[in-house]
Amino acid sequence: MSALLIATNRYFDNHFERPGVKLLPNEFYTTAEDMVLMTVLGSCVAACLHDPYAGIGGMNHFMLPDDGADPGAAASESMRYGAYAMEVLINELIKAGGRRERFEAKVFGGAAVLAGMTTINIGDRNADFVRRYLALERIRITAEDLQGVHPRKVAFMPHSGRAMVKKLRLQVPGVTEREAALAREADRLRAARTRAQVELFAAKRPAAPQPARPRIELFGGRGTAPGAGSPSAGSPYAANLSRKQEA
């Protein structure tokens, strides 16, 4: 497995007057430092987890929900999918001293940024996924800003758990292009799953019925199960067998 995609784009945030890290799609970051984690979201979702007792937190940024993930894929590819991105974030916080039962979540994103996206609304799927995942993990969502049509800029302070969101104009340089590429990728994955289902159906077709093999049933004496023992003396089968032996 390749190295996990930990965000490395560090900077100093003049607005919040503290060090910051900018997260790109597929990345995550965990820390106990008093800093700000920043990301821009379209249909993608960012989950921000915080342990108020330990004073640690983290953020991820995933592009698609759990379907389509290849268990054999490298970590850099799997981080695109919500199931893997959430698992990594939770595990890394636990390694740093957090406790799952204390985690609180704030979730953002899942917008329908591309006009006319009706057949595949990636944002809705991502939003539904993160809610279901956290419910199954019994992690409480304390704040959310999901779905809608506007991209978002999210700032999260992992030490305090404070989060802020800013709605952006519809056409943000880089976001629209990324969303179009993501829609094409979702189409490709859906087509691949359809092909796999067709191949699986073809492979499982029942074989053509074979003609029944002729059977000779042997009747034994009283108390003997059908098919067991030798033919009884005096039976037609025994008489025929005796004549063949004499010949």
UniProtKB/Swiss-Prot annotation:
Pfam families: CheD. GO terms for biological process: chemotaxis. The gene is cheD. It is an enzyme of class 3 (hydrolase). SUPFAM superfamilies: CNF1/YfiH-like putative cysteine hydrolases. The lineage of its organism: Bacteria, Pseudomonadati, Pseudomonadota, Betaproteobacteria, Burkholderiales. This is Probable chemoreceptor glutamine deamidase CheD. Keywords: Chemotaxis, Hydrolase. It comes from Burkholderia orbicola (strain AU 1054). It comes from the Bacteria. Its EC number is 3.5.1.44. GO terms for molecular function: protein-glutamine glutaminase activity. Signal peptide: none annotated. Residues 204-247 are annotated as: Disordered. Probably deamidates glutamine residues to glutamate on methyl-accepting chemotaxis receptors (MCPs), playing an important role in chemotaxis. It catalyses: L-glutaminyl-[protein] + H2O = L-glutamyl-[protein] + NH4(+). Residues 227-239 have a biased composition (Low complexity). CDD domains: CheD. Belongs to the CheD family.
